Amino acid sequence: MESLKRAWNQLVYTFSTEDRYAEYTPQGSTNVVGGEPFDTSNASRIQLNEFVDGAEVGGNDGVSECLLAWRHIDSWCSEHNPDLYATLSSPCTNNDIMWAEKDLAITFPAAVRASLRTHDGQEDVESMQGASGLIYGLKLMGLEEVVIMTRTWRNVAANLQRQMARMEQQQRAKSSSELPQTVTPQAVKQKGYGKVDNQDYHANPHLQKDISQNYNKQFKLDKLPKQGSIPPLAIQPVYAHPGWIPLVTDHAGNHIGVDLAPGPKGKYAQVILFGREFDTKFVVADNWGDFLLGFVNDLEKGNWLLVDNTDDYLNGEGDLVFVDHATRGPILNYLAVLKKRSWEKWQSTKPTQPLTSASVASFSTSSSVVNRPTPADAAGQARKTQGYSPMVPGASSNESVSFIPDSDVIMEESNLTQTDASSKGTTKPATPNPMTAPTVIRVSTPGSPSAAAEAPEPPKKATPPKAAKETKTPTVTKESTPASDANVDTELDSKNTETNEDTRATNTAHSMAPTVSSAITDLTAIDEPVATAGKPKDTEKTDDAKDVHEANKQDLTKANEAEAEENAVEPKDNEVSADSKVKARAESKSDHDSKTNNIPEKKVPQVTAKALPESDRGQASDAASTKSDKKAKPAEDPKEHDLKIEKLNEDFETVAL
């Protein structure tokens, strides 16, 4: 009867007690598990500042944030998704937390304790219709699930440690020549464990399993990928660790948990992402309270959406998913969102590293950044105009170098653009366009003889040679004449032709000084009335033309005398008397004058010439002679030509005697 009563009381206690880790006792004063009593008088209090073996407790960090976050979560769930609010479990007792800590040989952080004392995770959402995970589809695990999942991951970590130890032992055995090498036979092709004879089982106790085809290894990969963390050195670079306590799961082997064994640059009780898909672990919050408060901020910002993929009205409001309210983009996995935020936070706080020797070693020759030696006499000005770039460590002043930035080196785009512009300025100087470049002509005056020497020569590409010659000719302005004035133009051309012939005659008779000089004087006297004919009113312009003509004659005389000294003797038949030639020219011109007087009065075009300095008169005469040669000479009577030749021969003989 007593035993029946005790069994009944134990059954009632099992359904009514909140201490899930405590057993029933008839006295009711203590709850004993394994014979060790715990005081339950202060079970409603949250224990803080517990001792952690080998580490310092984080204190009460995150407790206030955790309590504030749970108030907002309860309010939001009851308003927007009552079915989700119904999945939240009742609080844990203090004894439950203590026995869980004893089983795991840890002490939960204060923020985790406060969370468990508010809600012991979620109920079995898979068995409840229309229920989903609280953290955007991720389930918040209860205390019992936390203990089970922690033990599972600890088994994984222990197996990894044993595998690594076995691999190290095999490497040492291979490197040691003293130990005998055991030979492992080929796998038996029959089902079940094969029989092995004459093998040393003491050297390899697992030999029977190794050679069997039915033995399934626990780890499929021969070598795990390299493990890392963001930020670096904040989490230990291992696949699994006994100090990682999972609190949230996606039912696929990935978790959000607290790290009780952080890396050198980590923080105790930091919230991390780890699991089968995270070879690189991420720190997402400093403590559990900050993580829950971040989740509440996403809810308050509107980064959520309830999705119902079924037509069943009993299915509830739908699943809670993450959608960015600012962009209204697609549905995102919350683990990926946390991963991205952790990366961006680390990048924003990452300091800019200075230029190191490792990054200097990555310099290679190219033309992106150009350093060229500058002349010693104009070093300062050359650095401003020739694209001078400051030298960098490890570079030479006589070679072109370019900097290839590493992943940890930041180069300013403005500096690169500036350097490219300077390098272009040094390699290809700007050349003026020959079609559009202006031509500047400076005429030296008698008062400034050095002006012509000081004038800069125009670029060869800017002005063609023909254009340069035309600019130095005396300016001659002619009025446009109608077709009826063609005869007058012919007469002017004949005059220019005669002037050119007179010049050549002077060159041939330069050795006859008195006669030739008198002939040139007579020729000038004859040309003057012809040049002034038809324009008696423009006396000033004709005077200027006379001066130019006389200056040209003087220059030609000097040049001819110099040539005469070089040519001592010339054939006698080719010498022509200047006096006879002058007389012949005078007769021909008189004939032209008589013909001109018989022509009815017509407007004669005015020919004006600007006075040029002495330095340019020779060039003007050469250009005039070249122009006159190009024009067609008038037809000459053969008889008159013979008479002219005879007169010139007679005059030459007279002068020679």
Curated annotation (Swiss-Prot):
Annotated region (Disordered), positions in chain: 168-193, 366-402, 416-657
Protein family (similarity comment): Belongs to the KNR4/SMI1 family.
Source domain of life: Eukaryota
Name assigned to this protein: KNR4/SMI1 homolog
Residue ranges with Low complexity bias: 444-455, 473-482
The organism of origin for this protein: Eremothecium gossypii (strain ATCC 10895 / CBS 109.51 / FGSC 9923 / NRRL Y-1056)
Basic and acidic residues biased stretches: 492-504, 535-561, 569-604, 627-650
InterPro entries: Knr4/Smi1 (IPR009203), Knr4/Smi1-like_dom (IPR018958), Knr4/Smi1-like_sf (IPR037883), KNR4/SMI1_regulator (IPR051873)
One GO BP: regulation of fungal-type cell wall biogenesis
Biased composition (Polar residues): 174-187, 416-436, 505-521
Any single GO CC term annotated in Swiss-Prot or TrEMBL for this entry: cellular bud neck
